Amino acid sequence: FLPGLLAGLL
């Protein structure tokens, strides 16, 4: 999982 995707979910 990419950090960008995690930040996008939040």
From Swiss-Prot:
Originating organism = Euphlyctis cyanophlyctis
Indicate what this protein is called per its UniProt record: Temporin-ECa
User: Which body tissues produce this protein?
Assistant: Expressed by the skin glands.
Instruction: Say which family it is in.
Output: Belongs to the frog skin active peptide (FSAP) family. Temporin subfamily.
Sum up the protein's function in the record's words: Has antibacterial activity against E.coli HP101BA (MIC=12.3 uM), K.pneumoniae PTCC1388 (MIC=9.8 uM), M.luteus PTCC1625 (MIC=8.3 uM) and S.aureus PTCC1431 (MIC=10.6 uM). Has no or very limited (<3%) hemolytic activity at concentrations of 15 ug/ml and 60 ug/ml, respectively.
Ordered alphabetically, the record's keywords are: Amphibian defense peptide, Antibiotic, Antimicrobial, Secreted
BP term (GO), one: defense response to bacterium
**A cellular component annotation (GO) from this entry:** extracellular region
Q: Does the keyword Cell membrane apply?
A: no
Does the keyword Secreted belong to this entry?
yes
Write down the superkingdom of origin: Eukaryota
Query: Where does it reside?
Result: Secreted
